[in-house]
Amino acid sequence: MNSLIRLTGDFQTARGSRPGPATLPAKGTVTAERISHIRKSLETVLSKWPKDAIIEDILVSVEYRQIVAKSNRIKEMLNGGKDSEPELSIRGARYLDFNGNHPRHLMTHYVPEATIRSTISKLRECERIVVDYFDGLMNADKMVDLVKNDKLKQKWNPAVSHTLTRSGFAQLIRDSYYVNEFRIDKPPAATDENAIVTLFETERDPQDLFEELHIDVSPANLLENSVLLTETEYRTLLERAPYLVAMSVIDLSSYAPMSDEGSASPAISSLPEYPTDEPIIGVIDTPFEEKYPPYFSNWVDYRSCLPEDIHPTSSDYRHGTCVSSLIVDAQAQNPSLDDHCGHFRVRHFGVATAGKFSSFTVMKHIERIVAENQDIKVWNISLGSMEEVSRNSISPEAALLDKLQQKYDVLFVVAGTNSDNGKPAYLGSPADSINALVVNAVNRNNEPASYTRRGPVLSFHHKPDLAYYGGDKGDTITACCGTGAYPAVGTSFAAPLVARKAAYLIYKMHLSCELAKALLIDAACAWTTPDDMDRLGYGIVPVQIEKILETSNDEIRFMLSGVATERENYNFNFPVPVSGATYPSVARATLCYFPKCNRNQGVDYTDTELDLHFGRIGNDGRIKSLLPNNQGEEDCTTDEEKARKKLRKWDNVKHIAEPLTSRSKPKKVYANPMWGMMIRKSSRYQKGSHDPQRFGVVVTIHNLKGENRIDTFIRQCSAIGWMVERVEIDNELKIYEHSQVEVEFE
């Protein structure tokens, strides 16, 4: 078996080119009538906006003609000048008709009335110019002429217009091509239960808004722009200020109850009575059984977060105790799932009782717990909602996990939630967390379990990430609670088994959270992407940790970490072994990163995009990537919808691979025999484009001749400046053990 290789080296950087003048697509046209329609829709917004609104500015939504890239969003419309550009006024984004024939963006902006009136005036002037100077219609050729015609340039001001610049006119034409109309969006419907309501971000403090609306909201029920409201309070808000409401979800979460069928049996284990220096995994779940402590209780540091007036019953303890039992000692009760990861300590936080509970309350607990326990790098959450997640916004619970993961450099392993009636259902929160490692369940036949729910989330983000064994009817997982071993079924019990592997990689193999996630996904996917990615994610994780950290002798697997700081981040020095004039190999690569996220942006939730290109370097100097991808190139013709669906644009996991089949053939070697990697970085916001973004990449190369070329690869990497390290399991374990020794100074 070949060990995993860690490469350490520098990526070169280059800034992207500045955008050129505003243009139209080759066959695109904009008529004076279209401009007039857009202007009138904006005038309607002004007339319909409540005169007694309790916020200073106006929330106006722009409907685009399609799913638009950042470069095709409005730039002249709703432009309030420096530091008031349209991208800074966005307060929400969602899709219209995403699964229909005409998917498109709807974005909500928060702008002063003066900015809207200014846009109306500019559109009126733009319409006049199109009629007077361009025969009532603009097309791509006229837009080019507008830039290159020196005579037109010289006479523009004041002959053509003294209020609208030539570049401003051109940008208005481009904006008009992509915009359908403006409007005031409708708020979400009322609910019959308590709801977590998110307000649009304005200059007003949410607490002050509720006081002015005479709605009594406790500060304890506020979390940033989200608030927990009763059914009556929410209806009052919709009656008095519906324009404030960005999104809402029911405040009820649960977990699929464990079956009462079967009975507990004595637990059998050789677990040492007390732990020593084993890694700690955090568990946030129902209470841990202390009245009848299970055999592994010395390995669990339990801390109750429940109010003192709540007295849990025996059923309240079962779920959380069973989850922790699998983390501590899963192999004892499930020999066929022995992952060779050893034992783990658990710091267990009881935040909910059996059945339904307030997800808002749990959110408040999670935020505090993670902040106060920063020594824990891996957290398991097997609680979730029975309600399906929204297609247009991330859940509040998932948004919190994404924020905490990015802020504290931790990894959440989250259960994919269960269907309780056998009917297909989308995932429940917080399994829509983008940064978390979301785990669904399979049976022993490697098929989705009968209760498995499905992704994607936000209409196109791949979730779940992975699948693992969670038991099913007649073939359960064995967990332990206070009364002994117990038959368990659900994603709740698949997740902790994956959390063990993640913790092993992060604590004992010294991998970053990004690399641990990438390595698990790469190993699960292998050379075959599942047909049912909506339920299986990228595949089923191998049982034994060696299958993740080692490869067969005809494969080379290496990993590297970096920080993307500029538009282009590249290294063209990967010496993939050559045989004669060919590369007798196929390859795959997996990129993971944890971007900052903004729930207020709706479907445009992630702030940063990293686009992965890896492959041979052609004679033109470009990377011939494993997945054909010309995003970022001058000849790019990929539209935003295809980029999101096919190339995973804005998804924080990128997996690209060549197929490995009996028909796979060696590839040509070009003038430069090296392979290259390019990571193109872009931001939702122009001002955020230089913020650094950490990433991890795992690459696997399979030799079609069955040859072991790892020594050649290591030797060549060292010769060209890479720092090369074999990740030997035994060596890494010794390093971990030595790091846990306490040194006493006299």
Where are these regions (language model features)?
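Extracellular S/T/G-rich loop segment that most often corresponds to the catalytic His/Ser-adjacent loop
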Residues: 285-287, 426-503
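C-terminal subdomain of the subtilisin-like protease fold in secreted/lumenal serine endopeptidases
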Residues: 507-586
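Mature extracellular/periplasmic domains of secretome proteins
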Residues: 8-12, 270-277, 340, 357-380, ...
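Long, charged/polar, low-complexity intrinsically disordered N-terminal extensions
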Residues: 1-186, 724-746
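Protease zymogen maturation seam
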Residues: 5, 158-160, 164-195, 204-279, ...
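Exposed low-complexity, polar/acidic, P/S/T/G-rich flexible segments that act as propeptides
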Residues: 584-624, 682-746
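Subtilisin-like serine protease catalytic core
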Residues: 270-303, 309-359, 409, 433-435, ...
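Subtilisin-like peptidase catalytic core
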Residues: 22-47, 72-81, 93-95, 112, ...
